[in-house]
Amino acid sequence: MSQSYINVIGAGLAGSEAAYQIAERGIPVKLYEMRGVKSTPQHKTDNFAELVCSNSLRGDALTNAVGLLKEEMRRLGSVILESAEATRVPAGGALAVDRDGFSQMVTEKVVNHPLIEVVRDEITELPTDVITVVATGPLTSDALAEKIHALNNGDGFYFYDAAAPIIDVNTIDMSKVYLKSRYDKGEAAYLNAPMTKQEFMDFHEALVNAEEAPLNSFEKEKYFEGCMPIEVMAKRGIKTMLYGPMKPVGLEYPDDYTGPRDGEFKTPYAVVQLRQDNAAGSLYNIVGFQTHLKWGEQKRVFQMIPGLENAEFVRYGVMHRNSYMDSPNLLEQTYRSKKQPNLFFAGQMTGVEGYVESAASGLVAGINAARLFKEESEVIFPETTAIGSLAHYITHADSKHFQPMNVNFGIIKELEGERIRDKKARYEKIAERALADLEEFLTV
């Protein structure tokens, strides 16, 4: 394949990472991004790597699978992780970022790279004669989605996910909330709105009866568990919320708390957490409260949360449809297409779920596209690593039941020998092995 550059289509997390990895290997890149010419319903800016759901990149500890994945990516020179570290905001044991600052930094690093040419245009055909990384994301334009659909054996895979509302911090009644991270992990980074049992029951009742925005009648409601609307959780039952986003464990009342409580209990019946959304600390999002309620209903129901009675919503929650491919049948473990060998795919459309996972897939696809360009053999990362196990999972899962997957220790190759019973100790060992295997892999 004679060519002088590689195409990357889409400048989200995966596309930005792929383009950067290719350029860092000395190969010119044409990076196509349609925003600026054509917008999507969910994106608010024309910046690259815009975060449309939460501003959290989740746990940072190596005993957390996504924490391990991030450490592997750091060692591989990820531009997404570098930008995230530079724009992080307080979030306890998690890595959360200033939403706008993060995407602005990624944009600047990519746009200013001497080997990356940014083309603001919509691509409607899949190239056949140029090595191309397709990373158009779950919000792929209709024209290109049709071409991918044809590659996808005509099967339409999709699910819905949603974003949580964002609130002006100056409109939160601080006398009714308290600052704390769960189990006092890291710095006190979350505002916590405690509820008594009666307050929770009233809130739950209002939530399950609130009016949702309509879906297209021909589409079934299929949600990804990690980004499920709060009203859908509520309809599954009270325990789903109390063991999920409103879990009170580790969020005891502070000693100076004077608000309502159930008797002498030290822990609230339920807690709503709010997380800082920007570096200035002027915006907070309601953690785990992705929603598809009508905007008026969001205001009515969420203002029942203690401290949010007069809250001003800077952005209401929204829901969008995400599409993904039949990766077990269509992709190699290198993220290369089995059907059209000049193509690589990356990001959520491949069935990896989550910001970090999307960027990781872009990193691997970019490395392998660069290797193909140089006529070198592509690389498959070890299944003992988080980055390798994710690629293995999406390309080896049962196609009939394939659904998007977050990175987790369950998909990473088991440790040899007798199973370590203590979960933390087991995860530490898995992480230790992963980083050692990655180091060895990179030196071969």
UniProtKB/Swiss-Prot annotation:
The keyword Flavoprotein applies. It comes from the Bacteria. PROSITE patterns: GIDA_2 (PS01281). Its main location: cytoplasm. Keywords: Cytoplasm, FAD, Flavoprotein, Methyltransferase, NAD, NADP, Transferase, tRNA processing. It catalyses: uridine(54) in tRNA + (6R)-5,10-methylene-5,6,7,8-tetrahydrofolate + NADH + H(+) = 5-methyluridine(54) in tRNA + (6S)-5,6,7,8-tetrahydrofolate + NAD(+); uridine(54) in tRNA + (6R)-5,10-methylene-5,6,7,8-tetrahydrofolate + NADPH + H(+) = 5-methyluridine(54) in tRNA + (6S)-5,6,7,8-tetrahydrofolate + NADP(+). Catalyzes the folate-dependent formation of 5-methyl-uridine at position 54 (M-5-U54) in all tRNAs. InterPro entries: FAD/NAD-bd_sf, MnmG-rel, MnmG-rel_CS, MnmG_N, TrmFO. Pfam families: GIDA (PF01134). It comes from Streptococcus pneumoniae (strain ATCC 700669 / Spain 23F-1). One of its GO terms (molecular function) is tRNA (uracil(54)-C5)-methyltransferase activity, 5,10-methylenetetrahydrofolate-dependent. Its EC number is 2.1.1.74. One of its GO terms (biological process) is tRNA methylation. FAD binds at G10, A11, G12, L13, A14, G15. The keyword Lyase does not apply. It is found in: Cytoplasm. One of its GO terms (cellular component) is cytosol. This is Methylenetetrahydrofolate--tRNA-(uracil-5-)-methyltransferase TrmFO. Its cofactor is FAD. Belongs to the MnmG family. TrmFO subfamily.
